[in-house]
Amino acid sequence: MSRPSATKARISATDLLDGLDPEQRAAVIAPRGPVCVLAGAGTGKTRTVTRRIAHLVSSGHVAAGQVLAVTFTTRAAGEMRTRLRELAATGVADPSCGTVQARTFHAAAMRQLRYFWPRVIGETSWQLMDRKFPAVRQAAQAARASTDPDSVRDLTAEIEWAKSRLIAPDDYASAVVEEGRDSPAPPEIFTRVYQNYEQLKVSGDTMMLDFDDLLIFTAAALEENAVVADEFRDRYRSFLVDEYQDVTPLQQRVLDAWLGERDDLTVVGDANQTIYSFTGATPAYLLNFSRRFPEATVVRLVRDYRSTPQVVGLANDVIGAARGRIAGMRLELVGQRANGPEPEFTQFDDEATEAAGIAARIKKLQARGVPASEMAILFRINAQSEVYEQALTEAKIPFQVRGGEGFFSRTEVKQAMGALRAAADRSDLPDDVPLDRLVRAVLVPHGLTEAAPPGQQARERWESLVALERLAADLAAMQPNLTIRELVSELQERAASRQPPVVDGVTLASLHAAKGLEWDAVFLAGLTDGTLPISHALGDRDGTGAENAIEEERRLFYVGVTRAREHLTLTWALARGEGGRKTRKPSRFLAPFLPAGSSTQRAASGKRSKTTRDHLDPAGEELFERLKTWRLATARDLDVPAFVVFTDATLTAIAEKQPADGAALVKIPGIGAAKLERFGADVLAVVNGGGVG
């Protein structure tokens, strides 16, 4: 395999560093060996890692064919390959960089398994299962478990979780108890389903492999066959793993098998964007990287090129309140863009008013030149989308639902609508039964229960049915004499009015589906306790399990905030329906940021939310005012908004805790190492009674 010339390498190495900030440059030129790049949201991660690969190749440290880069989505792998080809095509990097292998874990494993299979397994052939559903349904039937579609999908997801965590069927029951996990079926029943499923995949001289098996068999081949391992490790010498906070134990096992005793590994991630633990992902490997490799080079990318300083400031405060070991690795981002508008916090009386208010705000942004395709409404669960779909439809604003179907296009909603139509066509319905009771009676056989069922798919189906029941109740409340036939007609009209998805429309997406994306304007909607954090994260768990679940919800909120480039609006409603009891509370994650100054929006009712300073004693209130005076003077000196120095929430915490030294000050949410170094002495002087002005 040819190596690039020294002259070409020197030219390319110089060109590759052009336009990089100091931290990005440090990551690119870090020596071969264990390297950990902690990359915050918007910090140019993809640009950095592709240039690191190109630098290693162009500088002659490793040949392009000896590099394997892996990530978690086909889209991310494709983007990495495109960037490398562009660097090669433009002469910035060695031409061979365009041939570097950048794949998902599963794609890389399948390629390797096809090559090594005959030597490892022999004459037994294998086929990749394109769908697990039929096999899991058959396994469930044999185990006398539920075989309705949602149950089968939940059983499938649980098998995937168990395999990703390296949990064998016989170990499942003890594992779910140890991890405090809700099983979609009684553990002993699920164990039989899991066992049956694994047995069904083997038939004579043919094996069916699912995507997890690709990883399992690849790891086993390298672990158990020294000749195969030596050949693979001679081919691939240098590895890079993107989104390392989302790796599963099974993926780490494959990575360890690839590496052997070597340490030429670069990992990139942000533990505070860990939001997929329900799939088996764990940030533990990222958290322990320096422990495993004490000599590792660690680089922190903290310059945020995506969002305005105002959005970055809020994001820092959100994650600054995090607790637990993951929070110890948080990155305090530093906004690099010009100043923009302050994030807006808006309270509404009910959900419909909230959705209409968001639609009106979108109209205003459109009038100011923000394209619909550069705006997004993000929410915690897919079932929340209906009210926003309706508001956008009524406002004639185009939209698309990402990572899911439109509300009326979902299978469970279509089935429920069919049942309601059938009920409306009956002639034997009693006239004295209230419409809400009639609707509930129709929906109960389709899965509407008092409490959410276990299992992700079953819960999502239930959430859609609850949303449909609530929509029917709201329509009935607005029209007291509404009949079931009229209700069905109204629902059908709403379904028909939803325009087909359009590429250039406003994006509606769950927070999970929004990961990795960004927009000029983002609306984080429905931010009430029980929705974010989600009710089952609060649940009846206690101790570490409950704390971990709530902290993952906080990280999900953080991911939502960091999707916004410029305009960020956070909204919540006090009641579900118009005129309903205002029993809802804003998300607990909003508590430190509720309106306390002129920079935030008034609530829709015209009343301000209670400020976060109400609990301060007179001395604390006086200190808060002095801190505000200092902040204003400092902001003027730096020519930045006061929000960028410290938020009101941070000043309130300082006034409450009155830290005596830097060690105490840095523990306060919103004060990281950078702000401690920059403002710490001045703040402590104000706390001690002087230094204002």
Q: Where are the predicted features?
A:
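P-loop NTPase Walker
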Residues: M1-G122, W126-Q127, D230, A284, ...
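Conserved RecA-like helicase ATPase core segment
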Residues: S2-S12, L16-G19, H55, P249-F348, ...
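Conserved helicase NTPase motor core
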Residues: D18-I29, G33-L38, T48-V49, L68-A69, ...
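ATP-hydrolysis module of ASCE/P-loop NTPase motor domains
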Residues: P31, S96-T99, P118-Q199, G204, ...
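Helicase P-loop NTPase motor core
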Residues: V37, T43-I53, A64, P294-T297, ...
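Conserved helicase C-terminal RecA-like lobe
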Residues: S183, P371, S385-I397, G406-A596
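C-terminal accessory/binding modules appended to enzymatic or scaffolding proteins
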Residues: T611-A660
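Small-residue hinge/turn detector
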Residues: P669-G672
